[in-house]
From Swiss-Prot:
Function (record text): Involved in resistance to abiotic stress.
Species, as recorded: Arabidopsis thaliana
The family this protein is said to belong to: Belongs to the CYSTM1 family.
Induction: Induced by salt in shoots.
Tissues in which the UniProt entry reports expression: Mostly expressed in roots, flowers and siliques and, to a lower extent, in stems and leaves.
Top-rank taxon: Eukaryota
Protein name as it appears in the record: Protein CYSTEINE-RICH TRANSMEMBRANE MODULE 12
Disulfide bonds: none
Regions crossing the membrane: 40-56
Annotated stretches, region: Disordered: 1-34
Length: 63
């Protein structure tokens, strides 16, 4: 069996060296964000409680 590095991609597909992140996106042209997203563990106590209450309320309505 051939090694995966020795195989060429099917015709019409670019080689791995030629592929960028995504077509039309450049690292220099990214728009700045107006807000910072929080990491999963950075949510506050009140936000967690409200989320739990909403989930309980939705479960009560569905079941």
């Amino acid at each position: 069996m051939q090694d995966m590095r020795d195989q060429n991609p099917p015709q019409g597909y670019p080689a791995a060296e030629q592929v960028s992140e995504q077509p039309g996106q450049d690292k220099k042209k990214k728009k700045p964000r107006f807000f910072e997203t929080k990491q999963k563990g950075d949510r506050g106590f009140i936000e967690g409680c409200l989320f739990a209450l909403c989930c309980c309320w939705i479960c009560e309505m569905c079941f």
